[in-house]
């Protein structure tokens, strides 16, 4: 990310916890959204509107949508207005799906509605020691009688290894930015253009008998599909 004069900020005078603009990530122009700041990133009506405009801008300009999020959810003191704003944003994110790449990076606690947005992303990166869930450990305990920690309920390790919500985890934000840049290098800006081409010395007609060897011979057997993919992708890079 440039973080400097090259960034084009949009709706920068509206204030609140959401800021966005057109920026660069490893040389690729993207619509970059930041959800953080005051009141633990709680979303007010204007914040929901900013999220909606950011998603609409990405779709109209055919640019990838990259969101860094840490939010406690809709601002309680704003009532139904905040919930409506979040719903408007969610609708715009749905409209982006399948049109432009959507990548989320969880940089801090992400609770309630914003946690649901992760399910609309094509890829989710979580920084270590962050968590994301709709309802917290106390409420879950009241309903189930089970005790949970933030990490056990919705931590980065849980979402990467068990729920599948997180596709990648990183130790810090810089590492996450580098990873997002790599992911973008494999993807087109939008659905109407071809993805970037990478040179490869891996022959297209290379036999992959090892992939077949991984398939169990019994109907009750199991295998890790990632091992199969590693056999067939170019240069074994997965």
Where are these regions (language model features)?
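Terminal-region recognition feature
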Residues: 1-103, 109, 114-116, 120-131, ...
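Small cofactor-carrier domains centered on a conserved lysine used for covalent cofactor attachment
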Residues: 143
């Amino acid at each position: 990310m440039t973080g400097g004069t090259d960034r084009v900020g949009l709706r920068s005078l509206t204030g609140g916890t959401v800021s966005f603009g057109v920026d660069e990530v490893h040389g690729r122009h993207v619509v970059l959204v930041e959800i953080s700041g005051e009141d633990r990133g709680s979303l007010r009506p204007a914040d929901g509107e900013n999220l909606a405009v950011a998603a609409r801008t990405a779709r109209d300009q055919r640019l990838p949508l990259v969101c860094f999020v840490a939010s406690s959810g809709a601002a309680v003191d704003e009532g139904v207005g905040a919930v409506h704003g979040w719903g408007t944003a969610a609708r715009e994110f749905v409209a982006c799906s399948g049109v432009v790449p959507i990548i989320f990076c969880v940089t801090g606690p992400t609770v309630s509605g914003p946690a649901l947005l992760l399910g609309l992303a094509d890829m989710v990166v979580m920084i270590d020691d962050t968590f994301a869930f709709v309802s917290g450990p106390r409420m879950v305990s009241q309903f189930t009688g089970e005790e949970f920690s933030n990490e056990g309920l919705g931590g980065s390790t849980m979402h990467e290894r068990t729920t599948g919500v997180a596709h990648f985890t990183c130790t810090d934000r810089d590492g996450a930015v580098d990873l997002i840049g790599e992911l973008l290098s494999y993807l087109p800006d939008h659905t109407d253009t071809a993805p970037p081409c990478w040179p490869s010395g891996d022959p297209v007609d290379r036999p992959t008998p090892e992939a077949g060897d991984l398939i169990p011979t019994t109907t009750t057997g199991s295998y890790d599909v990632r091992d199969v993919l590693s056999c067939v992708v170019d240069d074994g890079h997965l």
